Amino acid sequence: MEINTHNAEILLSAANKSHYPQDDIPEIALAGRSNVGKSSFINTMLNRKNLARTSGKPGKTQLLNFFNIDDKLRFVDVPGYGYAKVSKTERAKWGRMIEEYLTSRENLRAVVSLVDLRHEPSADDVQMYEFLKYYEIPVILVATKADKIPRGKWNKHESAIKKKLNFDQADTFILFSSVDKTGLDASWDAILEKVNK
């Protein structure tokens, strides 16, 4: 499948099933804790500066944001998790919204699960990964902010992340940087492989 990534736009924001686009265009969901670099990942992948708004206020994305890419693929930006200043009620609401999408959406082909390469995965990161494995949803694990760590230490950080998550070798692991575009091609290859299956 040839995709013109320049032909991308935000399509709609949805709070529940009734708002999802009604068609069979494949979707890739993007999940990760607040401030992991999800918006930067989307903007880098689509070669745009601010298609996905990078928010200085974590926890701002409270809906599922659907991005249309060339009418052939969609990215679905899932609300960032693990942000402490959001009330328990809000967190529970997000949880239900995310769970409903991930477990019932037939268009979903895989989840890009983003973690910060600099830090050991949080309890929320582990829970998200276990959730995806439990529901047998294909995972592309993307470790962001690779430019913040010397190249010589990448392997050490990668191993620590894989160990903490009990990483399944059948899943894809990609080191990524929105600053120097490390992992850009590998991410597209992994996504298109899932979409074309």
Curated annotation (Swiss-Prot):
InterPro entries in the record: G_ENGB_dom (IPR030393), GTP-bd (IPR006073), GTP-bd_ribosome_bio_YsxC (IPR019987), P-loop_NTPase (IPR027417)
Binding site for GTP: 32-39, 59-63, 77-80, 144-147, 176-178
Record-listed Mg(2+) binding positions: 39, 61
A GO biological process held by the record: division septum assembly
Gene Ontology molecular function, alphabetical: GTP binding; metal ion binding
Cofactor: Mg(2+)
EngB-type G domain ranges (all copies): 24-197
Stored Gene3D superfamilies: P-loop containing nucleotide triphosphate hydrolases
Keyword list, A-Z: Cell cycle, Cell division, GTP-binding, Magnesium, Metal-binding, Nucleotide-binding, Septation
Function, as annotated: Necessary for normal cell division and for the maintenance of normal septation.
Sequence similarity: Belongs to the TRAFAC class TrmE-Era-EngA-EngB-Septin-like GTPase superfamily. EngB GTPase family.
NCBIfam families linked to this entry: GTPase_YsxC
Protein name: Probable GTP-binding protein EngB
